[in-house]
A protein has these predicted regions:
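Central hydrophobic cores of alpha-helical transmembrane segments
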Residues: 371-381
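Extended C-terminal subregions enriched in glycine
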Residues: 344-369
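C-terminal TM-helix exit segments that contain a strictly Trp-centered aromatic cap at the helix terminus
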Residues: 53-60, 127-137, 314-321, 382-393
């Protein structure tokens, strides 16, 4: 992680003439200072949405699943759509933290902390949906293989839904440990700057006695690499297992082998879009434009563009395989998606996920903050509709025409979904006021190689050296 030479053509990752002390002050300011008006506005809206969603959840649990728009044919709808959408959003955090760490990508330094927090908070939202969907959430622990005295009660290890339980719990625990490990030097920094004894005690407990000695740093880097190695397979395996919820069934439109890679690409695609959405808001609210630069936004836009193209290829491959299979029911399932009663959701998905990311080929657009923000939201709207199309359009047309039906969401469906978005932002905003949103210790390691003033000095030194010769 030591500083090394960087080509002058590379744009700086820290702009403004920043010293090590400036980095500490800038990162600690949102935690130590008072919340501004923008923070309170966003927090109030998020809290109102969360409370509405909480009311809808309580109503569902006390009344029953009949409060949703489910019917005799469409037994899975918005609940599983939202579950898959939230799990997918979490993938970018692990990819930025683990995969880009192993590839030694310096641009991850400023964005990894918030991306990891986003992973944890989105997995928490995802976990709510299967629990509510049980109908009797107080029996939720029955999905865990806990030895019991209930007679023949035991989990079915052949069920993809049980695989989900293991995948999500492993993902959440590894992400939490990874995130916390990265936070240790930053908690220690806040502990040393704390003014009140209570704050000092809290951050002292959270920092696990971090002293900043060489031995601490050595162990920190070793643990980071080990956790990155553990988390990298999780990026691929978690959404693969989520796709098995569909791929291991026999329903036309679900029973296809392309789903695992297609889901993983879609997860990274939607995750990076959400990271972009959050960081563009946060760099403004927390005054962190010098650390989350246009260069960071551009690099994430390039990832969105590439994964969007992969998702587009997956859509076309899916259509080709349905045609090539010669199975009439498979062909009908895909034809019905594009031309049936839900045609609008299919074409909305295609427009948002395949066409909109292609505008990123233009450097002018991918370096424009407002355009990036709009496209990142459009992409996540498209990815929600992708899950809706996969789930609802495959179910609403059965082998028996007498079972054909339409799905109509109720206010409870919408309320729970909006409530989880509100809950996510409540958690994220509270995190941004309690924890450092940028890994200041890691940003300092690239300051001399990628800092604005250091690069300028080195370039000037290079010119002087060549003039002397």
């Amino acid at each position: 992680m030591s500083s090394h030479y960087e080509a002058p053509i590379r744009k700086p990752l820290v702009v403004g003439s920043k010293s090590y002390h400036d980095v500490t002050v800038d990162v600690a300011r949102p935690v130590e200072g008072r919340a501004n008006k923008q923070w309170w506005t966003v927090f109030s809206i998020a809290l109102a949405a969360f409370l509405w969603g909480l009311g809808c959840m309580i109503y569902t649990v006390t009344t029953g699943i009949g409060t949703w728009g489910l019917n005799k044919t469409v037994g899975w709808a918005w609940d599983i759509t939202n579950f898959v959408w939230w799990v997918g959003i979490g993938h970018a955090g692990t990819l930025i933290s683990a995969v880009l760490l192993l590839f030694r990508q310096k641009w991850r330094m400023a964005i990894n902390r918030s991306a990891e927090a986003m992973t944890i908070f989105s997995v928490m939202q995802a976990g709510l949906f299967p629990i509510i969907h049980m109908g009797r959430p107080w029996l939720g622990y029955w999905v865990l293989p806990i030895p019991n005295q209930f007679g023949s009660l035991w989990v079915n290890f052949n069920s993809p839904l049980l695989w989900d339980v293991f995948a999500i719990s492993t993902y959440l625990s590894v992400s939490l440990v990874f995130w916390w490990t990265g936070l240790l030097p930053d908690f220690a920094m806040l502990r040393d700057r704390a003014v009140t004894p209570f704050t000092k005690r809290v951050y002292s407990t959270l920092s696990f006695g971090w002293s900043g000695r060489a031995k601490d740093w050595q162990r920190f880097e070793e643990v980071s690499l080990v956790l990155a190695g553990l988390a990298t397979p999780l990026v691929l395996s978690v959404h693969t297992i989520v796709s098995f919820d569909f791929a291991t069934s026999v329903i036309p439109g679900w029973h296809t082998t392309i789903l695992p890679p297609y889901f993983v690409a879609g997860a990274i695609f939607s995750g990076f879009a959400m990271v972009n959405t959050l960081l563009i808001i946060m760099r403004k609210v927390s005054n962190l434009e010098d650390y989350i630069t246009v260069q960071h936004i551009e690099l994430m836009n390039i990832v969105i563009m590439i994964t969007g193209s992969i998702v587009g290829c997956a859509y076309i491959t899916e259509l080709f395989v349905a045609w090539y299979s010669g199975v009439e029911y498979e062909q009908y399932a895909f034809l019905n998606r594009a031309t049936g009663p839900y045609w609008w959701s299919y074409w909305l998905m295609m427009t948002c996920n395949v066409i909109s990311p292609q505008v990123m080929w233009s450097k002018k657009i991918r370096t424009n903050i407002m355009a990036s923000f709009i496209i990142s939201i459009v992409v996540n709207v498209g990815m929600w509709f992708e899950r809706f199309v996969i789930i609802v359009t495959s179910l609403h047309r059965d082998y028996l025409p007498s079972s054909w039906t339409m799905f109509q969401p109720t206010f409870v469906d919408a309320g729970i979904y909006i409530g989880t978005i509100g809950f996510f932002f409540v958690l994220f905003l509270l995190y941004s006021r309690s924890f450092p949103v940028i890994a200041q210790a890691e940003v300092k390691t690239i300051l001399k190689s990628s800092g604005d003033n250091y690069k300028a000095e080195r370039e000037q030194h290079g010119h002087n050296h060549s003039d002397n010769h």
